[in-house]
């Protein structure tokens, strides 16, 4: 999945219950989330619990996170909405 041309649907950070406020509760910024969504080396999958698409990768600060998101529009432009993001252990191979 290539999201480099996707638009990201962020709420206002000061709005209670916003997606940007929610990721901040996990110690992440929108820039870190976007660095994974748009980054090289990102792995995509589907969440077992929610059925939503997920992206695993390293942030610009080097943290390994998962981003759970919804696809709002599959046409051009692709629009995605981050639901949550949090740090996870990096898989060992």
Residue ranges of model-derived segments:
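Ribonuclease/tRNase effector modules and their secretory precursors
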Residues: 1-93
